[in-house]
Amino acid sequence: MEEAKIPMLKLGPITFNLTLLAVCIVTIAVIFAFVFWASRQMKLKPEGKQTALEYLISFVDGIGEEHLDHNLQKSYSLLLFTIFLFVAVANNLGLFTKLETVNGYNLWTSPTANLAFDLALSLFITLMVHIEGVRRRGLVAHLKRLATPWPMTPMNLLEEFTNFLSLAIRLFGNIFAGEVVTGLIVQLANYRVYWWPIAFLVNMAWTAFSVFISCIQAFVFTKLTATYLGKKVNESEE
């Protein structure tokens, strides 16, 4: 299977992946459109789209309640909800269509199937939880935790690095593998006409399974974010 080319834009020393930028914008637009649509004409007794939105909010709030102190959970509920929606939509975006130019340039993919994107997202989470730790507990107390007990300081620092790395690689591995298998199934239909029905059925089953896995990965990513955040800001961690 021939590897698709990626359209790039080079500005000075920085090279931009145009496909990745485009699908990130689409991801944000989809999330905004869904929340805007679901939050219109809200009623005291929720129904339909409002029920779906409130269920999602309650579901993500439940994640925060497990790992954050009660007095802090509401402060981070919107952040966790945004992370969950963003990762869930980004994971599934590349499963349902494939866009390529006649020159072989790939114009559509899941943002989270790109390792650089996942590393950047993981770096944002890592920096955010440390900044919140300093803001909530103070710089001295935050650094003290990393050096307690002091003989374990190197291991504590290594743990922070592995948390950052595993958060990105876990997400990338699952989503990238899903897109690769989907591509292989689609290629199956190109060999013989009589393979089309089989490829179609297998692709439908695999796509449904991939959607499930993508949502699970969004849940895991959000849960780990709440876990790391709780370790830095909870008073019980003093």
From Swiss-Prot:
<keyword id="KW-0472">Membrane</keyword>
<feature type="transmembrane region" description="Helical">
    <location>
        <begin position="114"/>
        <end position="134"/>
    </location>
</feature>
<dbReference type="InterPro" id="IPR045082">
    <property type="entry name" value="ATP_syn_F0_a_bact/chloroplast"/>
</dbReference>
<keyword id="KW-0375">Hydrogen ion transport</keyword>
<keyword id="KW-0066">ATP synthesis</keyword>
<feature type="transmembrane region" description="Helical">
    <location>
        <begin position="18"/>
        <end position="38"/>
    </location>
</feature>
<comment type="similarity">
    <text>Belongs to the ATPase A chain family.</text>
</comment>
<feature type="transmembrane region" description="Helical">
    <location>
        <begin position="76"/>
        <end position="96"/>
    </location>
</feature>
<feature type="transmembrane region" description="Helical">
    <location>
        <begin position="193"/>
        <end position="213"/>
    </location>
</feature>
<comment type="subunit">
    <text>F-type ATPases have 2 components, CF(1) - the catalytic core - and CF(0) - the membrane proton channel. CF(1) has five subunits: alpha(3), beta(3), gamma(1), delta(1), epsilon(1). CF(0) has three main subunits: a(1), b(2) and c(9-12). The alpha and beta chains form an alternating ring which encloses part of the gamma chain. CF(1) is attached to CF(0) by a central stalk formed by the gamma and epsilon chains, while a peripheral stalk is formed by the delta and b chains.</text>
</comment>
<dbReference type="InterPro" id="IPR000568">
    <property type="entry name" value="ATP_synth_F0_asu"/>
</dbReference>
<keyword id="KW-0138">CF(0)</keyword>
<dbReference type="InterPro" id="IPR023011">
    <property type="entry name" value="ATP_synth_F0_asu_AS"/>
</dbReference>
<dbReference type="GO" id="GO:0046933">
    <property type="term" value="F:proton-transporting ATP synthase activity, rotational mechanism"/>
</dbReference>
<keyword id="KW-0406">Ion transport</keyword>
<dbReference type="GO" id="GO:0042777">
    <property type="term" value="P:proton motive force-driven plasma membrane ATP synthesis"/>
</dbReference>
<feature type="transmembrane region" description="Helical">
    <location>
        <begin position="166"/>
        <end position="186"/>
    </location>
</feature>
<protein>
    <recommendedName>
        <fullName>ATP synthase subunit a</fullName>
    </recommendedName>
</protein>
<keyword id="KW-0813">Transport</keyword>
<keyword id="KW-1003">Cell membrane</keyword>
<dbReference type="Pfam" id="PF00119">
    <property type="entry name" value="ATP-synt_A"/>
</dbReference>
<keyword id="KW-1133">Transmembrane helix</keyword>
<dbReference type="GO" id="GO:0005886">
    <property type="term" value="C:plasma membrane"/>
</dbReference>
<dbReference type="InterPro" id="IPR035908">
    <property type="entry name" value="F0_ATP_A_sf"/>
</dbReference>
<dbReference type="GO" id="GO:0045259">
    <property type="term" value="C:proton-transporting ATP synthase complex"/>
</dbReference>
<comment type="function">
    <text>Key component of the proton channel; it plays a direct role in the translocation of protons across the membrane.</text>
</comment>
<keyword id="KW-0812">Transmembrane</keyword>
